[in-house]
């Protein structure tokens, strides 16, 4: 009898072990369908496209770019950028490649973003957002079917170069001139998003502009000192950002029921500003200067062979790696916020929710302006994640 009981216990133990070891491990991205990630915009999302459009030696292809990953990879960071982390969370098993480079695996998406990209004008050795969308259309038939495109995520960050160039060329622009320019930029953004939607895309992630006046390169060029931002550029960014949510609400509201327009808006402006103003909460010890560069804010010349730029000892203590772009540590934070944060950060849903939301159903929620209560909540937090 005892032998039978021992055998039974042994069988149960074996069964328990097999059950435990065969149970799927819970990881970020579990239950996320096999969809793609497509990125559009400027150097913040450029995965290596810029080097295909110029014969000039580019700083992001030289050390110390890629320092945290041991090798420059054409990205404007010491390592990975936010879309790289987002792709991991979406369980995409390959790195999202630069679409303009030959012989790359675009089976799960591609980056069409190019450094120096704008919405308006004709950027030198770069592409406007409209040109990036048209490039996607050229590649679509040979690489992605309609169902894959409809269920994939299309992520856009664009406009910073438009406002930086405008401010340099129009230093004395009055309020009405500024407002007219913001309207021109956002109208063009709406048209380009509509073009992408007409190409079959249905799930959009729009990242608001950063507080451009707080970028180290802007502080340095406009001599703001170490503790001040250039508020004229911040005001332009805020005017731009205020138009994004209502614009996307309208696109979703007017889309036919047979082809829903789904979106979310990532509040990148406040994600940066919060880390600038309460840097200790996020273990950033320098937020007003760059890890790599020269000048009053170490904001110029990182990666240029003919510039003897300074390199910080520990890049993870910095919010910015160069004069305009964030460190890998910050990029990973933004990836987490994009994928899983609440509506104080990204609304009306995060990307995890957007991906699993049925592609054939209209959105039940819309973007709403942040309230004073939301602002007070942000300001009252201690060691917060946002």
Curated annotation (Swiss-Prot):
Cited function: Involved in the control of the PYK10 complex size and possibly substrate specificity. May be exported from the endoplasmic reticulum upon interaction with MVP1.
Superkingdom of this protein's organism: Eukaryota
Subunit structure: Part of the PYK10 complex. Interacts with MVP1.
Annotated protein name in UniProt: Inactive GDSL esterase/lipase-like protein 23
Entry-linked CDD domains: SGNH_plant_lipase_like
Entry-listed glycosylation sites: 105, 165, 288
Gene: GLL23
UniProt KW keywords: Endoplasmic reticulum, Glycoprotein, Signal
Lineage, uppermost ranks: Eukaryota, Viridiplantae, Streptophyta, Embryophyta, Tracheophyta
Protein location: Endoplasmic reticulum
Family the entry assigns: Belongs to the 'GDSL' lipolytic enzyme family.
Pfam families in the cross-refs: Lipase_GDSL
Signal peptide bounds: 1-29
Active site: 43 (nucleophile), 322, 325
Tissue spec: Expressed mainly in roots.
Gene Ontology MF terms in the entry: hydrolase activity, acting on ester bonds
Cellular component aspect of the GO annotation: endoplasmic reticulum; nucleus; plant-type vacuole; plasmodesma; vacuole
């Amino acid at each position: 009898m005892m032998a039978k009981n021992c055998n039974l216990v042994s069988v149960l133990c074996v069964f328990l072990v097999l059950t435990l070891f065969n149970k799927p491990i819970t990881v970020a991205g579990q239950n996320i369908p096999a969809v793609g990630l497509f990125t559009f915009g400027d150097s913040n999302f450029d995965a290596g496209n810029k080097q295909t459009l110029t014969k000039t030696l580019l700083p992001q292809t030289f050390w110390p770019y890629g320092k945290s990953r041991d090798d420059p990879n054409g990205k404007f960071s010491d390592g990975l950028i936010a879309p790289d982390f987002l792709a991991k969370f979406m369980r995409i098993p390959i790195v999202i490649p630069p679409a303009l480079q030959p012989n790359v695996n675009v089976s799960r998406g591609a980056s069409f973003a190019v450094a120096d990209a704008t919405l308006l004008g004709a950027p030198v050795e770069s592409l406007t957002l409209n040109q990036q969308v048209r490039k996607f259309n050229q590649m679509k038939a040979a690489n992605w079917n309609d169902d894959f495109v409809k269920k994939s995520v299309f992520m856009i960050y664009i406009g910073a170069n438009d406002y930086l160039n405008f401010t340099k060329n129009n230093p004395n622009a009055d309020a009405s001139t500024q407002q007219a320019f913001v309207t021109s930029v956002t109208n063009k953004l709406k048209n380009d998003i509509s073009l992408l939607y007409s190409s079959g895309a249905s799930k959009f992630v729009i990242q608001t502009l950063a507080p451009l006046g707080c970028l180290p390169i802007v502080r340095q060029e406009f001599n703001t000192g170490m503790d001040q931002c250039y508020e004229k550029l911040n005001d332009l960014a805020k005017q731009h950002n205020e138009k994004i949510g209502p614009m996307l609400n309208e696109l979703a509201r007017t889309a036919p029921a047979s082809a829903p327009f789904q979106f979310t808006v990532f509040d990148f402006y406040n994600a940066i500003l919060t880390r600038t103003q309460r840097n200790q909460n996020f273990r950033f010890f320098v937020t007003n200067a760059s890890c790599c560069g020269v000048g009053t804010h170490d904001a110029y010349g990182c990666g240029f062979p003919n510039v003897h730029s300074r390199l910080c000892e520990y890049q993870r203590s910095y919010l910015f790696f160069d004069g305009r772009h964030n460190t890998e540590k910050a990029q990973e934070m933004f990836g987490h916020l994009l994928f899983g944060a609440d509506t104080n950060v990204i609304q009306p849903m995060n990307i995890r929710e957007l991906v699993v939301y049925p592609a054939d159903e209209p959105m039940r929620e819309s973007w709403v302006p942040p309230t004073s209560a939301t602002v007070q909540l942000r300001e009252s937090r201690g060691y917060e994640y946002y």
